């Protein structure tokens, strides 16, 4: 383990990849987290013409934050950086949930920003106090988001296709995330253990 990482408490929510001595403890999971940077660029380019007051303009920034915090966590496998990584992920799920509630008519669009800020402060505090609460909140929010997406007005085949694609990517990705933390389906020997793991696939699918 890199000397600097020994100063931090090891995470209790381990992932599959075996440790490697050096600066980057889990190389495959660290490198795969860079997929969020690619997603950030794609969203930024596709939303460049959107009004700056729209929630989607926050997505590229949040995705960059997720990429940075995820790289830091997987490189160190430190508990504190896992908390920060989870807080960043919750920023995205909070934004998706609040905007989904607005688009489905549960709240007015004028309320999305104060509600997003309030929920983000609350989820960050809860995650800082107990990492497990952060995982629980992210799971419940994801279920609520999928529920809202299912009930969005779907007036054309393109929208329906986009929603199906999102759900088909996120659902198996989330299952793999859970399996990885449970130690199920892990590759433990040889170079393959540092190439393909459930958490690696989660990064790619969720990005």
Show where each model-derived region lies:
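Multi-pass alpha-helical transmembrane bundles in non-GPCR membrane proteins
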Residues: 1-207
